[in-house]
Design a protein with these regions (language model features):
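A membrane-periplasm/extracellular boundary helix in multi-pass inner-membrane enzymes
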Residues: 203-204, 209, 224-269, 282-283, ...
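Short aromatic-rich membrane-water interface segments that cap or initiate transmembrane helices
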Residues: 20-22, 76-88, 150-165, 270-278, ...
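Transmembrane alpha-helices of multi-pass inner-membrane enzymes
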Residues: 34-36, 217, 355-409
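Alpha-helical transmembrane segments of multi-pass inner-membrane proteins
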Residues: 4-19, 32-44, 69-72, 86-99, ...
Length: 557
């Protein structure tokens, strides 16, 4: 099965322990991109006779890509590098969907491909659960360097974020449920693996997981009564949910006191900053509702909104897929995309039977999580969702769509697959240069070691958003800066909400005859980063008055 390479590398991506700035998920996501490109080539090479049609989502994704690239042309400060990233993710999503369709066609149904998907999720969740146990017991040294060291009492496997692990574990538990219901797994090992994964899920202390667990039980209740497995599935889901809630309470109220796990109480009961963040983003969206701020420009919208709604937490995503879409492509197009996608899912859910119901259940935790964070921004979730949607698409088509003759379709698909593979390789190569230069720049800023005299900053042709950041990190705020240097600082500060960049930009404005804009930038720091960080920035700014008297003209708050 050509899709084997895709799923093997997805599994690898979940387990890679490296997380380096500035793109901390790159080494986990890269295997997913490469696996998809390889699997596409294998699927096209192995195809005989007819090929699957293009996915139902192709037209919608084409509109979104036009929106992303149109923003580069029409919207100020939008960067082509962001559009390239959007392209590799959205095009990958559509191609993964097609791969799911083609695999189901080759296998004459979704049973065998779905079994492979379930096995991969069960394996990934189980291995991640074992890693979580090492993190919980502070025994990471035993597995170094094959495990990420936890810096809190919340475990996260090798995904570097507890809620990410929680979503993977829930998807793995759905897969285990299917394997047990179909007798592919005997009762004893199924119970053991479910217990292991459930305890690891408790250790994540994820409120998102609690919501997803309730949503899964609700989905089981909503399954049509005509489905033969409905009663058994409802009983299984109810028993598991009860066990999960009991274990969560036990960990919070009993083990939390025994082991002094203060983080447990905080993680499950502390108020979230999301509502405040959403208010900021809605205030920013109100300033540009028709066209949005451009793709991946959530930080820009937050900066606009923060001047009206001060907050404490900075973000590059809205922690809500719906709000992100509205910010990126505007309210009209965003609502249209959401309505079309929701309508398609509802129609297909009504047609779902047997394994397609389990496919929906597998994707539900990812959907719930996407309304509270941004797992959709990670290729190891987005591309897997595309493949599973391809399986759903194959089984639930009300009228089977005619396949495309291979002789006519294969050249175009080969071009698409080759172009995608080339884009993946080009972006991967450039990002590795970014990662190395980012490391060097951080050392330079901290005055650690010395950069070789012959070192040359990489020329980035695709990922220019990182090129701007690397340039900005090397600039020093001083009098006599050129307009181009100030423009670099401005672009970097608007794209990324990093405190050091914002302060450097504010200081540069004050030193170069723009006191009003410098004062505005200091107000933004106060509104975006909160009183403690602003107090440090203000003290640093005032400490330079003796050296630079022109800063006295800046009326900082």
């Amino acid at each position: 099965m050509p899709a084997f390479s895709f799923w093997a590398l997805i599994l690898l991506g979940w387990l890679v322990p490296e997380h380096f700035p500035p793109w901390t998920g790159f080494h986990n996501e890269a295997p997913a991109f490469v696996g998809l490109a390889v699997a596409l080539g294998l699927a096209l090479g192995a195809a005989r006779g007819r090929l699957a049609p293009w996915p139902a989502a192709s037209g919608l994704v084409a509109v979104l890509l036009l929106s992303a690239w149109g923003g580069v042309v029409l919207l100020p400060h939008t960067l082509a590098g962001d559009a390239w990233l959007v392209t590799v993710y959205l095009l990958g999503f559509v191609l993964a969907w097609w791969l799911g369709l083609q695999t189901a066609r080759d296998q004459q149904g979704i049973e065998r491909p779905w079994r492979a998907v379930a096995l991969v999720f069960a394996a990934g969740a189980t291995v991640s659960s074992l890693l979580a146990l090492f993190q919980w017991t502070l025994q990471e040294d035993v597995l170094m360097p094959w495990i990420t060291a936890a810096d809190t009492r919340r475990v996260f496997g090798n995904l570097a974020q507890p809620n990410q692990l929680a979503t993977l574990l829930l998807m793995g538990l759905v897969a285990l449920g299917w394997l047990r219901q179909t007798r592919a797994l005997h009762a004893a090992p199924a119970l053991l693996l479910a217990a292991l994964n459930t305890w690891a899920l408790v250790l994540t202390q994820s409120r998102t997981a609690l919501l997803s667990a309730l949503a899964l039980f609700a989905l089981a209740l909503l399954v049509p009564r005509a489905w033969a497995q409905r009663r058994a599935v409802v009983r299984l889901a109810g028993r598991w949910l009860a066990a999960f809630l009991v274990l969560t309470g036990l960990y919070r109220y009993v083990l939390g006191d025994i082991f002094l796990l203060q983080a447990t109480e905080q993680a499950l009961t502390s108020p979230s900053l999301r509502p405040l963040m959403w208010r900021q983003l809605l205030a920013g969206l109100a300033e540009s509702p028709w066209w949005g701020d451009g793709w991946l420009r959530t930080a820009t919208a937050q900066q606009v909104g923060a001047l009206k709604v001060p907050g404490l937490e900075q973000t590059n995503y809205a922690h809500n897929l719906v709000l992100d879409l509205l910010i990126w492509c505007g309210v009209p197009l965003g609502l249209l995309v959401i309505a079309v996608a929701a309508g398609w899912l509802w129609r297909r859910w009504r047609q779902a039977q047997d394994d397609a119901v389990w496919c929906f259940a597998l994707l539900l935790p990812l959907g719930v999580h996407s309304l509270l964070e941004f797992p959709f921004a990670y290729a190891y979730f987005l591309l897997t969702a595309g493949f599973v949607l391809g399986l759903i698409d194959h089984q639930t088509r009300p009228v089977p769509q005619a396949a495309v003759a291979a002789r006519r379709a294969r050249p175009g698909l080969w071009v698409a697959a080759a172009a995608y593979g080339a884009l993946v390789l080009a972006l991967g190569r450039e990002y590795l240069l970014v990662e190395e230069d980012f490391r060097i720049t951080r050392f330079e800023n901290r005055r650690i070691g010395s950069t070789p005299a012959d070192y040359v900053m990489p020329q980035l042709h695709l990922l220019n958003q990182w090129g701007i950041v690397l340039q900005a990190m090397r600039l020093r705020a001083q009098p006599g800066m050129s307009a181009a240097e100030l423009a670099v600082l401005q672009a970097a500060a608007q794209r990324f909400s990093w405190g050091a960049l914002h302060f450097r930009y504010a200081l540069a404005l004050g030193l170069n005859g723009q006191p009003e804009e410098a004062a505005r930038q200091m107000r933004l720091i106060q509104a975006l980063f909160g009183p403690r960080m602003y107090a440090e920035a203000k003290a640093d700014f005032l400490s330079q008055h003796d050296r630079y008297p022109q800063l006295a003209r800046v009326a900082i708050p």
